[in-house]
Amino acid sequence: MHFVEAKGILSSNNGMNIYRGCTHGCIYCDSRSNCYGFTHEFEDIEVKANAPQLLEKALKSKRKKCMIGTGAMCDPYLQAEEKLKLTRRCLELIDKYEYGVAIQTKSTRILRDMDILKSINAKAKAVVQMTMTTYDETLCKILEPNVSTTHERFEALMQFKKAGIPTVVWLTPILPFINDTKENINGILDYCMEAGVKGIICISICIDVFFLKP
């Protein structure tokens, strides 16, 4: 883990990534791609130490309220967040200035910030997006070894349902011959129905092509 002083925090579509890199160890992760310009090892987390200060400046300068998104490129609830609490500090600012938030994660650590998310949802809108890849817990621990299991994520969704916070599930990636079975997909859909999610996102089937040198 290393710290940097970032120049900006919000993208043109109001997305932010407080961290760069990941320690979840998901074997299918495409964020490792060279197209994202990483200059450090993916597991060596880059921490934008001044993220809260940059976010506050950006929120103050906006003319219209909007939804702030986080989690598209890097999970905001990595293990490092337990100690650093940068995601929590940014949520506190979103709450303070009465913006909405859409936050994507695979970690039940998000439950720590239930109080702030409830406050944001009362003033604007808070949407929790949880990725679910496989209903099979054994397979989950192989595909995503260092993060909450699918059942633990389901239990978190149930807590957000009880709190009245809308949720969305990313059913992705679908990996041919690995998690593309009827039993797996139906199992996740059953979780989604029980948790009362407001939407299910399934982008595409994931097929990686490897070119071997002769």
Region annotations inferred by a language model:
Residues 120-122, 147, 186-188:
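Short, hinge-like loop/turn segments at secondary-structure boundaries
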Residues 82, 140-143, 180-183, 187:
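A short secondary-structure junction signal
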Residues 152-211:
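Conserved C-terminal portion of the radical SAM core fold
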Residues 137-146, 172-177:
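Surface-exposed cleft-lining segments at the edges of enzyme active sites
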